[in-house]
């Protein structure tokens, strides 16, 4: 069941400029990020053993104390997502060369040890709220591509049993950037040329078949992410505008209100890949000159930024090593 939008915004109008908005990052001193107890993991293109490749880097919220978690010269690790308990990271790895190249889903401990393959020829993984389940999308084709929407079917992987189960809605396809709600009942994602949609942000049930197009609420663009309590979402409104809104998933259908931009950059740069901090007070994102924002796409000069919800944003990396896809790492849950 697909519930289509009937009152979409005309031509996806560009968001209004923020009052007094700054189109470039503020000075680093504008936000006190050193006091934040959470860290950030992201993909970065840098040299390992004399060879440039994609690695996963972990930093403090202010960009300090960088650690290369992967250090694999012959494997490209990308698209990291930290588990809600702060102990693990799921990601994709591009392995092989030429026609044998393939994108696979893995997870590992936060320190880079204990790597486990989840699925071959799969992509776009994210965690369930129990930190024991990973959702991922099967690749649409066997031949390697970085095209973000080249996906079909959503799967669940149980870390304890190793079992894979399909989502009940077998019609899910051409999705990307799936995000699982904190209560475990919903996903939000982008669809491109699939399921009766051209390009839209969707909400759909984790254990049902209903799919809802959020376009009618003014939620247009791509790559949505839930806030930590499931009552806010953030996403990219355009290449230059990042949005945030309130979302209510407790009724018969999703409702989105208070849609607003919070960061805007100049047209020579782009902003992508928003992610809420575990306390809901900050949003991390990627920023840099016009480039390929897709997972594994080349983006020279891109850095990781952090903003508060009022739109004060700063760069936390400055090396421009194609730093993208930031994901906040919660403080690890202590064992009882």
Stretches found by the model and what they are:
Residues 11-336:
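Sequence signature of WD/YWTD-type beta-propeller architectures
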């Amino acid at each position: 069941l697909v519930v289509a939008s009937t009152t979409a915004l005309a031509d996806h109008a560009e968001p209004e400029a923020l009052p007094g908005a700054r189109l470039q990052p503020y000075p680093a001193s504008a936000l006190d990020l050193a006091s934040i107890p959470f860290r950030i993991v992201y993909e970065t293109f840098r040299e390992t053993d004399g060879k440039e490749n994609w690695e996963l880097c972990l930093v403090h919220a202010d960009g300090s104390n960088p650690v290369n978690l992967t250090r694999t010269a012959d494997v490209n690790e990308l698209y990291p997502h930290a588990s809600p308990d702060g102990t693990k990271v799921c990601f994709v790895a591009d392995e092989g060369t030429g026609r044998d190249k393939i994108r696979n889903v893995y997870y590992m401990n936060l320190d880079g040890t204990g790597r486990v393959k989840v699925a071959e020829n799969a992509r776009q993984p994210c965690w369930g709220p129990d930190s024991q389940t990973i959702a991922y999308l099967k690749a649409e084709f066997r031949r390697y591509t970085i095209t973000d929407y080249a996906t079909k079917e959503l799967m669940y992987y149980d870390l304890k049993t190793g079992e894979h189960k399909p989502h009940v809605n077998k019609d899910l396809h051409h999705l990307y950037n799936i995000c699982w709600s904190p209560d475990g009942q919903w996903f939000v994602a982008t669809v491109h040329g699939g399921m009766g949609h051209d390009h839209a942000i969707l909400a759909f049930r984790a254990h049902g078949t209903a799919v809802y197009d959020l376009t009618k609420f003014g939620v247009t663009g791509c790559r949505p992410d839930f806030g930590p309590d499931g009552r806010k979402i953030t996403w990219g409104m355009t290449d230059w505008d990042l949005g945030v809104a309130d979302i209510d998933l407790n009724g018969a259908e999703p409702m989105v209100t208070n849609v607003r931009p919070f960061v805007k950059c100049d047209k020579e740069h782009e902003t992508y890949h928003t992610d809420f901090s575990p306390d809901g007070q900050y949003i991390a994102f990627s920023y840099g000159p016009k480039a390929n924002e897709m997972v594994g796409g080349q983006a020279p000069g891109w850095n990781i930024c952090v903003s508060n919800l009022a739109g004060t944003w700063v760069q936390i990396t400055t090396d421009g090593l194609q730093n993208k896809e930031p994901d906040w790492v919660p403080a690890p849950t202590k064992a009882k």
